[in-house]
A protein has these predicted regions:
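Acidic/histidine-rich catalytic cores and adjacent linkers
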Residues: 311-334, 350-368, 397-551
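Flexible loop/turn segments at secondary-structure boundaries
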Residues: 184, 212-215, 241-244, 267-271, ...
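Short, flexible loop/hinge motifs at secondary-structure junctions
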Residues: 1-166, 206, 236, 281-338
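Short, charged amphipathic recognition helices of the HTH superfamily
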Residues: 181-192
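Inter-helix linker motif
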Residues: 372-385
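Mobile genetic element proteins and their domesticated derivatives, centered on retroelements
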Residues: 22, 29, 50, 57, ...
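Short, amphipathic alpha-helical "recognition" segments used to contact nucleic acids or chromatin
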Residues: 170-182
Length: 551
């Protein structure tokens, strides 16, 4: 506020030295006040600017340190179908499957009526079907006939090949099914079998679950190999899996046809590449390894020491470290990058496609080959924003609405892809996520993240069959999480491997529409009633490709 001019015009004759001195003081004070007002206005503007910056940095710090605790996030609506109301007809869920479908009669019992009047004529039978289950002990005593030849040699009958130990195939399959399919802990299995009249100890149940499972381990490993060889994409995720009282991790790799689980003490990229390499032990520095090292910015002083070819440079981890030491490459970061590159090279040499799309939630260890990102996980970065003002909340809602609409357009594109629609969707992505908002640091940061990962989010435009989310991977890993809540961690290496193997085989059977119970019986009996799962995966993928080409 500017001070008014001097209110009194004092004649020159009355301007004594005192009056002049007072006038000078008043004029000086007026200039000082005007200067202070200007300074205050500048400081207020600066304070407003700094407050906005501090608020943005505070939001970023809270997100980085997770100071808010576990956020209460509502379920995403991105994948919910738009349900159209039905007019008339039956209520939802009222259509029941016929009980006569595939009904197999094991026993027929004829029931005659009581007090039948004399002279009644037989009119046929009225069917009444009952489903029941027989659970009882069935002990078998094999009498192995023994003969002595004329030469004095003894010949004895042989047990059936599927008979291993003193427990039959059905009982062994039942124990495996209860533990892995029904998630029944070992103590309850022991109690259950004893109530059925089976004489068995806790140690014997443990051995039935752990020992002589090499064929299952082999099949599960070949399921992974077949899945990686035939897949155009795989989804992946991991979760905690304690072992021997220490932290550990379980990683799942799969798609619509298979699931593979593997537990380890690390969730690093090196560990993930070991899974992709499978059961092989070699290290290969080929051209794909070279491209990986360049992308990861391996120093040139190390790069010039290497020779790249399709030949193996080492067999086993110790030999690989010795090879690098021989090249005078000893820094931890360089050894780490070269190990990852050699593992990647080995995996590709053994059949892994360099164009394989890996769909994940954004964890860095999965960002290899052709990486695709989950839209649902990216959308959470916007949904978590608090919105400190009404304007900020309005901006967040507008972005979410545009994002959901764009997501639905991507789903429509998956059904009917075209070049024109692909180009339009790329441009539309820039229109939505290229926007920036004044004084909304958190939203701008989220939009920058979308732009930085544009290619990974839009893999679907080049490969429409790739899902837009990792819901399937989370459903796979949830199987392991449920088991962990019931039984806790593992104590023995064999138990850890058995849990991984049978969890993967169970999920694979479910995806291929096979009964896990029939699968267990088939493998333990040694017949081919359930085909070899890796062969089924290859055959199914060939059928899908032929169908796609025919269309």
């Amino acid at each position: 506020m500017t001070l008014p001019p001097t209110p009194i015009d004092i004649p020159e004759s009355e301007r004594t030295p005192l009056v002049k001195w007072l006038q000078e003081i008043v004029a000086g004070q007026q200039l000082l006040i005007e200067h202070q007002q200007s300074t205050i206005a500048k400081l207020e503007a600066k304070v407003s600017e700094l407050e906005a910056k501090v608020t943005g940095l505070d939001e970023e710090l809270k997100a980085a340190k997770k100071l808010k605790g576990k956020p209460q996030i509502r379920p995403s609506t991105l994948n919910q179908e738009q349900k159209q109301p039905k007019s008339g007809g039956k209520r939802p869920g009222s259509d029941k499957r016929s009980k006569k479908t595939d009904f197999v009669v094991d026993e027929e019992l004829i029931i005659e009526p009581l007090d039948l009047p004399e002279g009644s004529r037989f009119n046929g039978y009225r069917e009444y079907d009952v489903q029941d289950l027989i659970l009882k002990r069935h002990n078998i005593r094999y009498l192995l006939a023994e003969y002595v030849t004329t030469e004095g040699r003894t010949i004895t009958g042989k047990l059936p090949t599927q008979q291993q130990g003193h427990y039959g195939v059905t009982l062994r399959a039942f124990v495996l099914y209860q533990h892995h399919q029904c998630r029944v802990p070992q103590p309850l299995i022991v109690e259950q079998l004893r109530e059925f009249g089976i004489e068995i100890s806790a140690g014997q149940v443990n051995r039935l679950l752990m020992e002589e499972k090499a064929s299952f381990h082999t099949e599960q490993q070949e399921v992974l190999q077949a899945g990686l060889e035939t897949a155009e994409y795989v989804h992946t995720d991991d979760t905690s899996a304690r072992h021997q009282g220490h932290n550990g991790y379980c990683t799942v790799i799969g798609n619509d046809l298979f699931a593979y689980f593997s537990s380890s003490d690390s969730k690093s990229r090196e560990n993930y590449l070991r899974l992709l390499r499978g059961s092989h032990e070699d290290y290969v520095l080929n051209e794909y390894a070279r491209s990986y090292l360049i992308a990861q910015q391996l120093p040139q002083c190390h790069l010039v020491k290497l020779q790249f070819s399709r030949a193996s440079v080492a067999q086993g981890e110790a030999a690989c470290l010795a090879y690098l030491q021989g090249l005078d490459i000893t820094s931890l970061q360089a050894v780490k990058l070269l190990t990852e590159a050699a593992l990647l090279g080995s995996a590709i040499e053994h059949g892994l496609s360099p164009d394989l799309i890996i769909l994940s939630d954004g964890a860095k260890q999965f960002a290899i080959l052709v990486h695709a990102l989950c839209w649902v996980h990216m959308e959470r970065g916007i949904r978590r924003l608090p919105g400190n003002t009404a304007l900020q909340r309005q901006e967040i809602e507008a972005v979410q609405e545009a994002l959901w609409d764009y997501y639905r357009q991507l789903r429509d594109y998956q059904d009917k892809p075209s070049e024109s629609e692909k180009e339009r969707l790329r441009l539309r992505f820039d229109e939505i996520f290229g926007q920036r908002y004044a004084h909304h640091y958190g939203l701008n940061l989220a939009m920058q993240q979308f732009c930085a990962h544009k290619d990974e989010l839009l893999r679907v435009l080049d490969t429409p069959q790739v899902p837009l989310h990792t819901n399937a991977a989370e459903a796979d890993i949830r199987e392991y999480v449920t088991r962990r809540k019931i039984s806790g961690g593992t104590r023995h290496a064999d138990g850890r491997r058995v849990r991984d193997t049978f969890t993967g085989l169970k999920k694979t059977c479910r995806k291929l529409a096979y009964s896990f119970w029939q699968y267990l019986l088939s493998r333990l009996q040694g017949n081919n009633r359930i085909p070899y799962l890796p062969d089924v995966i290859r055959a199914r993928m060939n059928q899908l490709r032929e169908l796609a080409h025919s269309q």
